[in-house]
Amino acid sequence: MYVEMIDETGQVSEEIKKQTLELLDFAAQKLGKKDKEMAVTFVTNERSHELNLEYRDTDRPTDVISLEYKPELDITFDEEDLAENPELAEMMGEFDSYIGELFISIDKAREQAEEYGHSYEREMGFLAVHGFLHINGYDHYTPEEEAEMFGLQEEILTAYGLTRQ
């Protein structure tokens, strides 16, 4: 999985960036999404607040904002068209590979790590996986959805080695 990583804060360590890349790749393999692309931007609470207001109409900072990429146009070609035009096939493959972007508030991650009594590394990993699952269609609006999403999220974090400490 290709992840474009941007640190708007200038405060995220190389270890956290590496962990985030590895964890997202691990989660992508688990979901069969290893050939996909996404972006992760680390932000402050102030920036998170702005984004939350812009995209979710919620006037407060949040820990992670997940923006799933859904192309406006549903473009399909039959196998014959793609076989006759290899450049088109390649272009469509690239078009389908981008799945979305995450904005992770490092301030919220620190606050929540302290509040929940685990490490900052664990919280950053949790937020990355949580956001990644949202981008891939998981949600927690109903008890059933929550059980499925939170179960998968815990399974990924535990298998990766980021347990609650």
Swiss-Prot record:
One of its GO terms (biological process) is rRNA processing. It is found in: Cytoplasm. It comes from the Bacteria. Zn(2+) binds at H130, H134, H140. GO terms for cellular component: cytoplasm. Binds 1 zinc ion. InterPro entries: MetalPrtase_cat_dom_sf_prd, YbeY, YbeY_CS. It holds the Pfam family YbeY. GO terms for molecular function: metalloendopeptidase activity; RNA endonuclease activity; zinc ion binding. Keywords: Cytoplasm, Endonuclease, Hydrolase, Metal-binding, Nuclease, Ribosome biogenesis, rRNA processing, Zinc. Single strand-specific metallo-endoribonuclease involved in late-stage 70S ribosome quality control and in maturation of the 3' terminus of the 16S rRNA. This is Endoribonuclease YbeY. It comes from Streptococcus thermophilus (strain ATCC BAA-250 / LMG 18311).
